[in-house]
């Protein structure tokens, strides 16, 4: 044995900066889902907006009912809650919110679409959350 101690090689992993809205939205929704901070579906989202419990809302641009879009947009503007329009399919929003079953290989199947999702608890702070909140009130992703 030698008298010289070997220095620990601490590897610091740097996080990539978030530059697109879709990735940031995915990370924020998944983080909120892990910390049980999501409201999914039109009824829960409207309740959380009216009680001003929602911190941010996501609305699928491909929503089948135009009245839903108008209602959520108006309520978010009235209560000053940031609203992000997600141009992806509502099944993508549902997948990000955890509305699916896993098959034997661990792949998502039976994905249920979600027209709207509200975040009431972000969980832990992240660069993605800061990036989204620094954007305008109504952003198209």
From Swiss-Prot:
Q: Can you say where in the cell this protein is located?
A: Cytoplasm
Q: What does this protein do?
A: Component of the ribosome, a large ribonucleoprotein complex responsible for the synthesis of proteins in the cell. The small ribosomal subunit (SSU) binds messenger RNAs (mRNAs) and translates the encoded message by selecting cognate aminoacyl-transfer RNA (tRNA) molecules. The large subunit (LSU) contains the ribosomal catalytic site termed the peptidyl transferase center (PTC), which catalyzes the formation of peptide bonds, thereby polymerizing the amino acids delivered by tRNAs into a polypeptide chain.
| InterPro entries, A to Z | Ribosomal_eL30-like_sf (IPR029064), Ribosomal_eL8/eL30/eS12/Gad45 (IPR004038), Ribosomal_eS12 (IPR000530), Ribosomal_eS12_CS (IPR047860)
Give any Pfam family that matches. Answer: Ribosomal_L7Ae
Q: Name one GO cellular component term.
A: cytosolic small ribosomal subunit
Q: Which organism is it from?
A: Plasmodium falciparum (isolate 3D7)
The protein's name is Small ribosomal subunit protein eS12
Q: Please indicate if the UniProt record lists Mitochondrion as a keyword.
A: no
């Amino acid at each position: 044995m030698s008298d010289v101690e070997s220095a620990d090689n601490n590897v610091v992993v740097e996080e990539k900066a978030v530059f697109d809205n879709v990735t940031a939205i995915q990370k924020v929704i998944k983080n909120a889902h892990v910390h049980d901070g999501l409201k999914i579906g039109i009824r829960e989202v409207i309740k959380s907006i009216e009680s001003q419990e929602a911190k941010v809302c996501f609305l699928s641009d491909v929503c089948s009912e135009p009245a839903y879009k108008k209602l959520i947009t108006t309520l978010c503007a009235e209560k000053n809650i940031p609203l992000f329009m997600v141009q992806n399919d509502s099944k993508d929003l549902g997948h990000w919110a955890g509305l699916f079953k896993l098959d034997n290989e661990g792949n998502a199947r039976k994905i249920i679409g979600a027209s709207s999702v509200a975040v009431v608890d972000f969980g832990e702070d992240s660069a993605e959350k800061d990036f989204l909140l620094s954007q305008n009130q109504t952003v198209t992703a």
